[in-house]
Amino acid sequence: MSAVARVVERVRDLSTPEGPGRAHVCRPADSRGTVVLGHGAGGGLRSLDLTVARDVLVAAGWTVAVVEQPWLVAGRRVAGRPPTLDAAWVPMVAALMSGRSRLPRPLVVGGRSAGARVACRTAAELEADAGLLLSFPLHLPGRPDRLRDAELALAPDPTWLVQGTRDPFGTPTELAPYVPRWAEVIEVSGAHSFPKGAGPALVAAMTRIAAALPG
């Protein structure tokens, strides 16, 4: 049975300058805070690492919101450019954290792949208290000369990264020189998308992170 089987998932429609977005919110009765996660450019909301992160964090008492970018809600197959992703993400997270139905702080921002990049670029604007980056894409496959280390440097303090040992977008070894001193990398056997067999290792990684998150 899923760790969130007893928690109702509520879907919230969210307005953005880039079109309608959506959030899938799981909120336990007594919440330690909120983790908002974004999906990757492939658009998978049910990737293994996102699913495990949600389940483990909710079981540990965190409210978790998995946010759909407008391009995915609209049924498009190609993700928007980084500026449009940021322009949609910021008001969606702000809406979740404000108003009569606001989710509780502290706020942890993150996501997988492209979603992790968005979370880093916008963390300061959203006054995030911590970060959770899954499969951070340091570079395109075969292009280690074009790094996204400047984005990684914007990750909030503290931040945790869960990275596949064979990720063609950047292995833990490749990440090491660029990881901020306030961030920790947890290695999990796998590539950019984790196989089902990585489930136990991902659960262990997320359990460790859940215990360390500020809240």
Annotate each language-model stretch with its function.
Residues G190-V203:
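Catalytic histidine-centered segment of alpha/beta-hydrolase-like enzymes
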Residues L154-P156, L161-Q163, D167:
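Short beta-strand/loop motif that positions the catalytic acidic residue
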Residues P106-G111, L134:
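Short beta-strand immediately N-terminal to the catalytic nucleophile in serine-hydrolase-like folds
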Residues G111-G115, A119:
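Gly/Ala-rich beta-loop-alpha elbow adjacent to hydrolase catalytic centers
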Residues E127-H139:
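A conserved short beta-strand
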Residues T165-F169, H192-F194:
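Acidic catalytic loop of the alpha/beta-hydrolase fold
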Residues R12-P106, V118:
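Serine-hydrolase catalytic machinery in alpha/beta-hydrolase-like enzymes
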